[in-house]
Amino acid sequence: MTGRQRERRRRRAGAAVAAAGLLAGAGLGAAGCSGSDAVAGDSRGGDAVLTLRKAADRLVGAGSSKARTSMEMAAGGTRVTIRGAGVYDYRKRMGQLKVLLPQDPAGVAERRPITELLAPGALFMKNRGAGVPADKWVRVDTRTLSDGNLVTGGATDPFTAAEVLLGTRTATYLGRTKVAGTQVRHYRGTAHLGDAARRATAGNKGPLKAAAGGFATAEVPFDAYLDDEGRIRKIRHRFSFLNGREKSPVAVASTTLLYDFGASVRVRLPRTEDIYAGKIAEE
């Protein structure tokens, strides 16, 4: 192995530490471990499985939207929530979120929002901490993460969240309700990450395949709320993983709220010289 190859490997490992540290900072750290379709619906909900598998395409048709995210998990007997907000372009598969970690247990240090840039196969983070200068970005290859970055970054990429539904195996239409004042159809079901990976677009195949093998189970229960155009307005996934400290799987609930479709999205990826290449501290 050449010196340059060793340096690239060291940088990838350091970036993975930085990403994993988001969950560690909230009290958890993710680590990898190692049918037939059933359709339930009615004349109002239609073919639930087919409808849900088309939801990602409906977002591409919409072009873009604003997004709010939340990730809930139990840490040391206390439930904590990581929140985020931003915009996403479903055609370019790029977005930007401001992610806020919960306050530290002592309640003394105020946490600065972490800026995350989402791109195919990559996650960029600024204000990450862990010894990274405030004006530098950390780049993470999401294909190297055992969870496919479904939870490690503290927020699920909105388009990846939608493509999880490509793996829908069972689904039930539960009726109409409202999300943020919009009439929606509520579906509840289970998706398989392996199935989702096989049907996903090129940028999500690798991450979803990694998640299928990295979570405690590849089956993901969900609640999805679709508007009359078939676009996701709200989706809640329940992931399960082993974090290396707990004997039993840790449950993480990731919720994504989408609104203001057609919103302007401008994402500029960092220049090479703005990406941190030094050592990243473990938390």
Can you describe what each PLM-predicted range is?
Residues 11-23:
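Sec-dependent N-terminal signal peptides
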Residues 2-10, 26-29, 33-283:
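Subset-of-secretome marker
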